[in-house]
């Protein structure tokens, strides 16, 4: 849809959809229909389903300009979540943008397991550490589910700013934010051991980079995606002291690469931790539970 085309024709949401879906599909965008509807709704500042009620409403020039710019961004494979500025996770809305990893549905399993574990722990002993918090989706979802004290760590100042904003927007005030690399980010006045340690670390091997979708490979933060040549760098760092950071009877939950279990588990077994893997909906080991 060029500017000259938009000036001559009367464009409606339906006509935009009929034109833009094949256009984005040709550009290699999956779920193009859904994305187009979301972008129209975003431009018109309404719920996506309400767009259906206004399929035949003529769009004014300003609305067309906004929609055209949004479609251009999506055609370049910019993630739809970055364009919209939000991502739903565990029933909550999280702000996301460049420099912040987009929460994945697979990570909700880790949150579910965390909440189940904490239910059996007295409230005062619910001491939780989230390593590599990103948008804060894990820490905030756990803190919203039940009373607990959470420390959330990330090496990215940008990610921490977004995470803190997400906590405010979700009504969570029980999280202490720490900038730094893994356990090194904790301050001297912080506690040294936790009942529950959570992490969705970077675990994609660098040799898989060419196979990733452009919207992931070219836009999401590399430090949150790639775990070095082997994909194990983050786990190797965690294994150095994770066993010392767990309270007696404590537990860690780590997200895994679909093929990562047999390479990750031995790193922690060497330190005396016992591991149990939980499969995702595709049957791949997705969450590793570690206990002392």
What are these regions (language model features)?
Residues 41-117:
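Conserved AdoMet
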Residues 103, 130, 152, 227, ...:
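Conserved SAM-binding loop
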């Amino acid at each position: 849809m060029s500017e000259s085309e938009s000036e001559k024709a009367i464009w409606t949401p339906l006509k935009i959809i009929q034109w833009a879906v094949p256009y984005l599909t040709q550009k290699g965008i999956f779920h193009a229909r859904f994305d187009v509807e979301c972008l129209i709704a975003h431009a018109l500042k309404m719920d996506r389903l309400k767009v259906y009620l206004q399929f035949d409403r003529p769009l004014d020039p300003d609305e067309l300009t906004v929609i055209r710019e949004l479609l251009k961004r999506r055609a370049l494979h910019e993630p739809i979540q970055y364009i919209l500025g939000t991502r739903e996770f565990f029933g909550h809305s999280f702000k996301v943008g460049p420099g912040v990893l987009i929460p994945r549905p697979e990570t909700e399993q880790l949150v579910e397991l965390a909440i189940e574990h904490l239910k059996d722990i007295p409230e005062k002993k619910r001491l939780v550490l989230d390593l590599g918090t990103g948008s804060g989706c894990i820490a905030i979802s756990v803190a919203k589910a039940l009373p607990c004290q959470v420390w959330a760590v990330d090496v990215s100042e940008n990610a921490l700013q977004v995470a803190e904003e997400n906590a405010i927007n979700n009504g969570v005030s029980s999280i202490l934010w720490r900038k730094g690399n893994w356990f090194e980010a904790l301050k001297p006045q912080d506690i040294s051991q936790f009942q529950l340690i959570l992490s969705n670390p970077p675990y994609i091997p660098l040799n898989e980079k060419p196979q990733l979708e452009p919207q992931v490979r070219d836009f999401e933060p590399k430090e949150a995606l790639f775990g070095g040549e082997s994909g194990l760098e983050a786990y190797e760092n965690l294994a150095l002291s994770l066993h010392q950071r767990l309270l007696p009877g404590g537990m860690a939950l780590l997200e895994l690469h679909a093929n990562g279990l047999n390479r990750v588990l031995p790193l922690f077994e060497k330190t005396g931790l016992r591991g149990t893997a939980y499969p995702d909906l595709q049957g791949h080991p997705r969450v590793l539970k570690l206990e002392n």
